[in-house]
Swiss-Prot record:
Reported function: DNA-dependent RNA polymerase catalyzes the transcription of DNA into RNA using the four ribonucleoside triphosphates as substrates.
PANTHER family reported in the protein's UniProt record: DNA-DIRECTED RNA POLYMERASE I SUBUNIT 2
Catalytic activity entry: RNA(n) + a ribonucleoside 5'-triphosphate = RNA(n+1) + diphosphate
UniProt-listed InterPro entries: DNA-dir_RNA_pol_bsu_ext_1_sf, DNA-dir_RNA_pol_bsu_external_1, DNA-dir_RNA_pol_su2, DNA-dir_RNAP_su2_dom, DNA-dir_RNAP_su2_hyb_sf, RNA_pol_bsu_bac, RNA_pol_bsu_CS, RNA_pol_bsu_protrusion
Organism annotation: Shewanella loihica (strain ATCC BAA-1088 / PV-4)
Official protein name in the record: DNA-directed RNA polymerase subunit beta
Keyword Membrane listed: no
GO molecular function list: DNA binding; DNA-directed RNA polymerase activity; ribonucleoside binding
Name of the gene encoding the protein in the UniProt record: rpoB
Amino acid sequence: MVYSYSEKKRIRKDFGKRPQVLDIPYLLSIQLDSFKKFTDQDPTGERGLEAAFRSVFPIKSFSGNSELQYVSYKLGEPVFDVKECQIRGVTYSAPLRVKLRMVLYDREAAPGTVKDIKEQEVYMGDIPLMTENGTFVINGTERVIVSQLHRSPGVFFDHDRGKTHSSGKVLYNARIIPYRGSWLDFEFDPKDALFVRIDRRRKLAASIILRALDYSTQDILDLFFERVQYKIKKDSLVMALVADRLRGETASYDIKDAEGNIIVEKGRRITARHIRQLEKTNTTELEVPVEYISGKIAAQDYIDPDTGEVLVSANAEISLEDLAKLSMAGIKDIDTLYVNELDHGAYISDTLRIDSTTNRLEALVEIYRMMRPGEPPTKDAAEALFQNLFFSEERYDLSKVGRMKFNRRLGIDDDEGTGILTKEDIVAVMQKIIEIRNGNDEVDDIDHLGNRRIRSVGEMAENQFRVGLVRVERAVRERLSLGDLNELMPQDLINAKPISAAVKEFFGSSQLSQFMDQNNPLSEVTHKRRISALGPGGLTRERAGFEVRDVHPTHYGRLCPIETPEGPNIGLINSLASFARTNSYGFLETPYRKVVDGVITDQVDYLSAIEEGRYVIAQANIEVDADGRMVEEQIACRHKGESTFMRAADVQYMDVSPQQIISVAASLIPFLEHDDANRALMGANMQRQAVPTLRADKPLVGTGIERTLAVDSGVVVAAKRGGYVDYVDASRIVVKVNEDELTPGEAGIDIYNLTKYTRSNQNTCINQRPCCSVGEPVVRGDVLADGPSTDLGDLALGQNMRIAFMPWNGYNFEDSILISERVAQEDRFTTIHIQELSCIARDTKLGSEEITADIPNVGESALSKLDESGIVYIGAEVKGGDILVGKVTPKGETQLTPEEKLLRAIFGEKASDVKDSSLRVPNSVKGTIIDVQVFTRDGVEKDKRAVEIEEMHIAQAKKDLTEEFKILEEGVFGRARNLLIGAGFAEAELDALPRPQLLVQTIEDETKQTELEQLAEQHEELKADFDKKFEIKRRKITQGDDLAPGVLKIVKVYLAVKRTIQPGDKMAGRHGNKGVISKINPIEDMPYDENGNPVDIVLNPLGVPSRMNIGQVLEVHLGAAAKGIGDRITAMLEEQRELAELRGYIKKVYELGEDVQQQVDIDSFTDEEVLRLAKNLKGGIPTATPAFDGAKEKEIKDMLELAGLPTSGQLKLFDGRTGNEFERPVTVGYMYMLKLNHLVDDKMHARSTGSYSLVTQQPLGGKAQFGGQRFGEMEVWALEAYGAAYTLQEMLTVKSDDVNGRTQMYKNIVDGNHQMQPGMPESFNVLLKEIRSLGINIELDQE
């Protein structure tokens, strides 16, 4: 493999054995692609905004004399960029402008004659835009729209598993689910009649809907039944024989062939042998006894030809009298329905008997009564209602997916068709459910991923947009009918409010629009790849059963079987598997390698769950020889959702990668294959809660996916084009682009601005640091700057810690963790948290609030950190209770005492009519002010601090733009100089000229002269561009802010808090091994090895066997080896060994392992590259052990040997306090530990004096309300059991809700009198009131 310059800085040793056929696809593509389909113009009009417009327009007036047509749309440019939107708290969106055409038709002339056409561009609200990382900025906060897994539109057949009826009989049902519109259900009742429901309302006989579709009784019978024909002879009946229909029945008469030989005797069962005999003798007719026809059902009406009287009506049972009547009337042929109990039930016939309607109108009225109970039905209303239910494109749409699923399920070859239902569709569904009831077909599995599809952002936004458009449509139609159309323009007809309201509501408050989890890069990526079954149109937590939550065979390679939340949402929220993607219909597909005649090819096909069922698919870990031929005869495969063994020749596909089945978070767990699934689930979930540490540390034992994840998450800065680094500082990186990657006529400079110390959604710190230096070559995709939780472009969520598995004085009992003081001293788990505190000055009824340093009754010391505007300085170190922003609020007039009046008269007005309402630091917080922002309403004078901040921003913007301009200008001058030197000018002569003079030289060579002129033009453009950009920036900075009504000014203060690790913080490994720190032990007390190196963390060995996450033990061994190798390299560097020896050792390390795929050609590295690699490996050689394809036990032992460590992975340890050796060897090694965002600082809390609940007068609960600890029912029992009567009395009265008692107690304590007089608790009064509300009067009498 060829490594780029920056990849050679540190190479991760990979133990993977399988070749990488397919790279992991871009991780955020599910979000970006979906939204791109929504906003991009689609000429076919099948998706996105275009589809929404085409489905609603043209809008015709009621009279048909005018219509509003849609022409095209375009999205404008957003006003603010993403960062500005986050600072100002506004939505990152672009205005949508739509070109509409109003057509007026001439009433007098022929229909369709156009009288007037007006075209105009109309503003239709703002559409939120997606940032390049797949998020939306809504009101200044980053949000993610989670994809939804919902039931695909189409038709589904199911049964109730015998739960509905007490007899346990299985009742079948069919449901037609459209994309939008009414649901249509068919269901059997226990008596085997078929019923229909519309929108889950009251059920009707299914034949009613057929009558409403204009089928007569006979048509209905013909659709669902075959006929049996009888001929009436003189004294007998002859039945037309269809031999197959007799199989399995018991003969009720002797069956004879044409010659009169008895083939089946009366009472015998008819078998296949008898049927073959009948077929052999060519018997086409059978003579049956006359009684045989009794009870059979007539297939049509039989009418007396003379009188016109109906002798037997269709669907009536024929009796012997009826037979005599028919015979008398001269009717010789009788057709009956062919039914039997086994596989041709008389369901529709029974249903018709229940059905009271006889014609179409009655059926329509019946449906109308069911849909609109209580309204008087008229013929037109009933017709219109039925028509609108399933046959109107405005009200009903199956969608492309729905039609495809519908047709495939009913065996119709064509995947295309209309979005509405047809008569034939409804009949086909009824025929299919009867076929299933007859046992000739199977029901569907609704948890199969072929029956559930993904709805992503774009589709959901389009649906919301359509909802808004439909609301507008009604208003437009009315205005077209009422207004004077000659005066009106399209703009006057359209009101954009309903559209933007619908879109805003979706992005702001939909269940699927979620506050982005921004703890670390992994949590961002997994949040964007989350698939939820909840949300509008989905399931609800309470109603979801076990089956929906369970892992289904079709999840293989599509949804991760491991990563799902614990708790009530388990199985309802899933994560996309690493290689999965959605197809054009919204079904999940996963890639497979094609196998032909037992040989694996490099062709990769994506298969959906439905397609996958047809093939035989082998796993990724099968043995293959050098030619790609399968070695073994019997191969473990999957076929139709089952695991089986097949011959190599029968295999059609094979997995692309062993990591195919798991999600990104799960594939970050090394040795995942050795962990129990429950613990792996916790491991995958807890990695998302890791807080970015101060100094990121790459994992020594990784899985090789760390770099992909860090780059795809967008937190690192990756090079867009190759070149070399021209300039680096803490906030920007400049890359000079390679000549061959330039677009003609550009300066060839890429500038990357870095994000510095900004706050994330979870209050963690987002900061980017450059990891390249000037002059380094870069190629496209190289990492230039690290973000939070990344180290040289690798995801680094935690720290590598030296751990020992041993008990230590009970300090690691029950998963507690003992850590060394060194960990805290070295700031290994120190994290920075940034809090945003805001102070709002409003207009009140009594006057406006004011932000000022002049605060009544506050001493000088409290104001020491404020400037003259009353706002805290940047850099001030503050603690709980300090004032950050001074603010005073007008107080209502109070009655003054004569003394106050006198003082007022002497010293003038305005002394005490304001109260202090300043913003103070919350009690438990201590930190440094890192930024202050002031937002002032338009038209309100800016204070001094606001002007200073503004000037600073303008100066910064000017500096940035000037530097950018200088760099670009330098690029132009450099190219001009090269051009002139090429044309024969002397270098010294050119260097003596002022730079701009280079562009006005003349060259004889014409092509070069034009090139120079082009550069001069480019220079002018750069200047103009600079002025324009600066003007835009300046205007944005100085313009007033759009604040909420009644708000004059907002001051936001950003406070950085540094949190070191301390007892009570939660830590975890990557294998679901979590615990709370119990003690920070002095370094000298920690166990140490023979070389005197103490361990950092002591974990309890009992946490491993019962939890079955053995992966952590293997990780510890491999981590020890990796660190040991790093130590060997450090020693070599310190002893200044020969470079050849160092190169040889590093080469040996990278070559270790059996048939490993990774090839690192250390020999091709220059000496400088080897040295730099060695320096980066001093802390340990990073290794990768991919899931299901990782390091083997032998390889770990070989690594330990190379590191000069015992291959058992165990060391002798000594007790730090006594110096005695522990009695047995201890497993010591390196494990990657994470500090989780469950910090004791955020949870610990103690109440002093606080607020009380209004009704019960008891203290509130919870840290946010500064609440108390509830002394609950069980605690009361405990005190009762101890007989601690006085303590109990105190708890229930003065310490809780005896209002008078507690105030009295406060007074007593102040006076030094330590006595209490308990009174009546308020909650007892509440109880009395509640009893009285039940109508029982209780009064307390004093004795």
